[in-house]
């Protein structure tokens, strides 16, 4: 029999006591009272935060939106079909956040940044809160750099700058998405990260957008965030904030970013649905009282940062769909008041063959010529005035039978100016060629060209400048001005093309 010494036993017991650690896990757990329509009412979550993520027994995640005295209103981020009344709910202690990183470029993700393009998980370099504070006044600088859209009508008369928020508004099927996609395609080689957020759209429409971006080699610098029409309202509601969070990751690294929200009308409708189901008091058009804050806190995140914060920028292009051209409805007026200008697309112009169907009279950019290069300022100043006078004269000429020569000339010039602003989809024009086109129009070089040949003439002029006089484009790209030498080259090119046309 072994000799067991009492002091050894006491040592072993003492060691075991020293090693013993009591782990207490405190969890905030509640009980489901009611579930249905993407909403759950939960009892017992006393210490839950507003916007906190909650986990149900079937691993469905929800967001605590309504904190009431006796229960919590939770919106579900999934189907939630296996959630039963009486089942438990656990508070996670986290606010909604997403992974971010350079590996997300070229990918299609859902509003929780999970890939939906069957290419595997991207490597994330960190996480960002979906809802984060907008930069303060001191952290910003005024918009001073242009963000070229490649659309002549916009870059000349409604210029967009880096860090600006420009609303694209119009009825359905007037080319709103086309304007946004052209802008993304035009950023090729400009070192701009683009994010396209599709909210409540058909999966086929999103697939078409992705296919277009791929064909134009624009997907390499673009992230697509898609929440389809059959996704829960919660995902449609958070999709724009996810897009903004992904853009902020690049913005705070000093990069220029462009975010397209297509469209915020559907986000407002999803938020209205959630609010009504949570029994929040309805206001105008049954939207909740904080629907203005829904959009303002999103669009205020767009900014041009000062040099101390890296000088990055986030440009926002929110899209709003109107009903029968009514821009005085609740959501359109809200977003118009938040943004720095709007591009109004008209159904009548679209149907009469003027595409992009931009109504120059109602459209405006509140940043103005600060977002233009000097060459464009030199030629575009007269364009808006000439078009406005032409629109007035055209309306008047429908009643008058005999017009004097000066009026006829002005009408003829206006028709040609309108013609040069027409542009095919997915074919953005570089700024130096836009300058040449507008110069040709406002200085009367097209007055003796047949109206049906104007587009052909413009194409020939662009080709001549590219092939025979490349120094013209080089001069504008480097100096940003239309110098006397460049103007001489342009006049020479116009004469050469005119001779070819008159033969």
Swiss-Prot record:
Lipid bilayer topology: Peripheral membrane protein
Residues annotated as binding ATP: 170-177
Site (Required for activity): 363
Keyword flag Cell division: no
GO CC terms in record: chloroplast thylakoid membrane; proton-transporting ATP synthase complex
InterPro entries the UniProt entry points to: ATP_synth_asu-like_sf (IPR023366), ATP_synth_asu_C (IPR000793), ATP_synth_asu_C_sf (IPR038376), ATP_synth_F1_a_nt-bd_dom (IPR033732), ATP_synth_F1_asu (IPR005294), ATPase_a/bsu_AS (IPR020003), ATPase_F1/V1/A1_a/bsu_N (IPR004100), ATPase_F1/V1/A1_a/bsu_N_sf (IPR036121)
CDD domains according to UniProt: ATP-synt_F1_alpha_C (cd18113), ATP-synt_F1_alpha_N (cd18116), F1-ATPase_alpha_CD (cd01132)
Catalytic activity: ATP + H2O + 4 H(+)(in) = ADP + phosphate + 5 H(+)(out)
A matching Pfam family: ATP-synt_ab
EC number annotated for this UniProt entry: 7.1.2.2
Keywords for the protein's UniProt record, in alphabetical order: ATP synthesis, ATP-binding, CF(1), Chloroplast, Hydrogen ion transport, Ion transport, Membrane, Nucleotide-binding, Plastid, Thylakoid, Translocase, Transport
Location within or outside the cell: Plastid, Chloroplast thylakoid membrane
Source domain of life: Eukaryota
A molecular function GO annotation: ATP binding
Role summary: Produces ATP from ADP in the presence of a proton gradient across the membrane. The alpha chain is a regulatory subunit.
Cited NCBIfam families: atpA (TIGR00962), PRK13343.1 (NF009884)
Membership in a protein family: Belongs to the ATPase alpha/beta chains family.
Subunit and interaction comment: F-type ATPases have 2 components, CF(1) - the catalytic core - and CF(0) - the membrane proton channel. CF(1) has five subunits: alpha(3), beta(3), gamma(1), delta(1), epsilon(1). CF(0) has four main subunits: a, b, b' and c.
Protein name: ATP synthase subunit alpha, chloroplastic
Upper classification of the organism: Eukaryota, Rhodophyta, Florideophyceae, Rhodymeniophycidae, Gracilariales
Name of the coding gene: atpA
């Amino acid at each position: 029999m072994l000799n067991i010494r009492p002091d050894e036993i006491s040592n072993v017991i003492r060691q075991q006591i020293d090693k013993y650690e009591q782990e207490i896990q405190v969890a905030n757990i509640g009980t489901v009272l009611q579930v249905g329509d993407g909403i759950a009412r939960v009892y017992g979550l006393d210490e839950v935060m507003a916007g906190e993520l909650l986990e149900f027994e079937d691993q469905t995640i929800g967001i605590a939106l309504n904190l009431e005295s006796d229960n919590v209103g939770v919106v579900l981020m999934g189907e939630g079909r296996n959630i039963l009344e009486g089942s438990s709910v656990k508070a996670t202690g986290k606010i909604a956040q997403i992974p971010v990183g350079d590996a997300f470029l070229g990918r299609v993700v859902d509003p929780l940044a999970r890939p939906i393009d069957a290419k595997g998980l991207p490597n994330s370099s960190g996480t960002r809160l979906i809802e984060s504070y907008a930069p303060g006044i001191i952290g910003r600088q005024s918009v001073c750099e242009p963000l070229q859209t490649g659309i002549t009508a916009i870059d000349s008369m409604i210029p967009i700058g880096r860090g600006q928020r420009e609303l694209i508004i119009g009825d359905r099927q007037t080319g709103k998405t086309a304007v946004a996609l052209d802008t993304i395609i035009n950023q090729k080689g400009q070192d701009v990260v683009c994010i396209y957020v599709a909210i409540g759209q058909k999966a086929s429409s999103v697939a078409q957008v992705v296919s277009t971006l791929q064909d134009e080699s624009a997907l390499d610098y673009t992230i697509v965030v898609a929440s389809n029409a059959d996704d829960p309202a919660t995902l449609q509601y958070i999709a724009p904030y996810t897009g903004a969070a992904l853009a902020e990751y690049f913005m705070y690294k000093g990069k220029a970013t462009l975010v397209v929200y297509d469209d915020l009308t559907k986000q407002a409708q999803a938020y209205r649905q959630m609010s009504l189901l949570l029994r929040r008091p309805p206001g105008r058009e049954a939207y909740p009282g904080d629907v203005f804050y829904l959009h303002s806190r999103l669009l205020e995140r767009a900014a041009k940062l000062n040099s101390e914060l890296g000088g990055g920028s986030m440009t926002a292009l929110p899209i709003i769909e109107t009903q029968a051209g009514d821009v005085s409805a609740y959501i359109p007026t809200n977003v118009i008041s938040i943004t720095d200008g709007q591009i109004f697309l008209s159904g009548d112009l679209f149907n009469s063959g003027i595409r992009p169907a931009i109504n120059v009279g109602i459209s405006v950019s509140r940043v103005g010529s600060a977002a233009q290069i000097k060459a464009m300022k030199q030629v575009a100043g007269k364009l808006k005035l000439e078009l406005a006078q032409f629109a007035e004269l055209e309306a008047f000429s429908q009643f008058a039978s005999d017009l004097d020569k000066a009026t006829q000339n002005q009408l003829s010039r206006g028709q040609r100016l309108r013609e040069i602003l027409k542009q095919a989809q997915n074919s953005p024009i570089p700024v130096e060629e836009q300058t040449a086109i507008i110069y040709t129009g406002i200085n009367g070089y097209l007055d003796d060209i047949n109206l049906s040949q104007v587009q052909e003439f413009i194409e020939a002029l662009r080709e001549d400048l590219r092939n025979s006089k490349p120094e013209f484009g080089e001069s504008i790209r480097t100096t940003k001005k239309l110098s006397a030498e460049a103007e001489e080259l342009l006049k020479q090119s116009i004469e050469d093309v005119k001779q070819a046309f008159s033969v």
